[in-house]
Amino acid sequence: MKIHEYQAKEILRKFGVAVPRGYLAVTPLEAEGAARQLGGGISAVKAQIHAGGRGKGGGVKLARSPDEARQHAEAMLGMMLKTPQTGPDGQEVRKVYVEEGCRIARELYLGMTLDREIGRLAVMASVEGGVDIEEVAAKHPDKILREWISPLTGLMPFQARRLAFGLGLTGDSVTAFVRFATGLYNAYVATDASLAEINPLVITVGGEVLALDAKMNFDDNALYRHPDIAAMRDPDEEDPKETQAKEYDLSYIALDGDIGCMVNGAGLAMATMDVIKLSGGQPANFLDVGGGADEDKVTAAFKIILSDPHVKAVLVNIFGGIMKCDVIANGIVAAAKQVGLSIPLVVRLEGTNVELGKDILAHSELKIIPADDLGDAARKVVQAARAA
């Protein structure tokens, strides 16, 4: 689960992480009032959406007066902010965060996430702050410092100091950085976060270490332990299809292609997308119906796929173990009739009750394209999508 910048900073404050003062605003007048509460001097008006790169898209503006803060808020609120992470359609700005300005001496990067290859939490730091860390990793990997944290000891002071020295910090800034990094680590662990990222982390002219921006993501499977964080979810920032999928306990992720996929099992779903790509197509989604899906769940999954206007063809790839092929077949038929299926549908079934499932599809009066194996199914659905 993702949250907004202002929410992440609210959490980090509780763990002693230094962040500038700021106030949320949902109207231009509230933004003006927030700037006055901050003293009426220089402030930053920041669009709140679940995407990075806001500054490049016009979503972060400096205001030198409360009146200018109001003007920036008027321009931002309601706009479709486009960044490299929002896609071409952009994301509507519904709220802004007005934050006090500071005199910046240096911009750095500090982030924490799980390194799945090593199986430990990785703390990353870089002198290249304020830019996309993925770009830095690709072009200048030598500029990223890393420390791997033992779950038995946590982040050790010597590791935080080593990062500070690697960033070229000296004097009181080293002490402030160690305190900052320790607070960020404590917040990451205590909240079951999957990502905690400060970009940029700034060193002020006075030597303070501040989180000028903050991003936190959380493990959905641990949210039952954090009802306060779960309450921070913003449905307006999520794909409606993904929200609907959660209601039916479906694993759904929207992608940019035009071939809808419905598969049982995450591994088979990823393999299906790979084979579609190898066959020259582009998957429109990842959708795992799981091993214990019933007819209603399959029907819901089918409707979610077909609600995407970019989908030109659908591939259903089922290996029936716990999941029975006849259940899938009945769900496909029910959903196709309910939504009035008008695009090509390729189905590959294998496993438990496969002959019964194929018989149900054959007598459904639907124009279903059968496939014998995954390679055959991928080729047929790519061809169908191109012809649609």
Swiss-Prot record:
The entry's keywords: ATP-binding, Ligase, Magnesium, Metal-binding, Nucleotide-binding, Tricarboxylic acid cycle
Annotated ATP-grasp domain residues: 9-244
Listed PROSITE patterns: SUCCINYL_COA_LIG_3
Free-text cofactor note: Binds 1 Mg(2+) ion per subunit.
Binding site for ATP: 46, 53-55, 99, 102, 107
GO terms classed as biological process: succinyl-CoA metabolic process; tricarboxylic acid cycle
Necessary cofactors: Mg(2+)
Documented EC number(s): 6.2.1.5
Pathway participation: Carbohydrate metabolism; tricarboxylic acid cycle; succinate from succinyl-CoA (ligase route): step 1/1
Highest taxon in the source lineage: Bacteria
Binding site for Mg(2+): 199, 213
One Gene Ontology CC term in the entry: cytosol
Binding site for substrate: 264, 321-323
Subunit relationships: Heterotetramer of two alpha and two beta subunits.
Protein name: Succinate--CoA ligase [ADP-forming] subunit beta
Organism of origin: Anaeromyxobacter sp. (strain K)
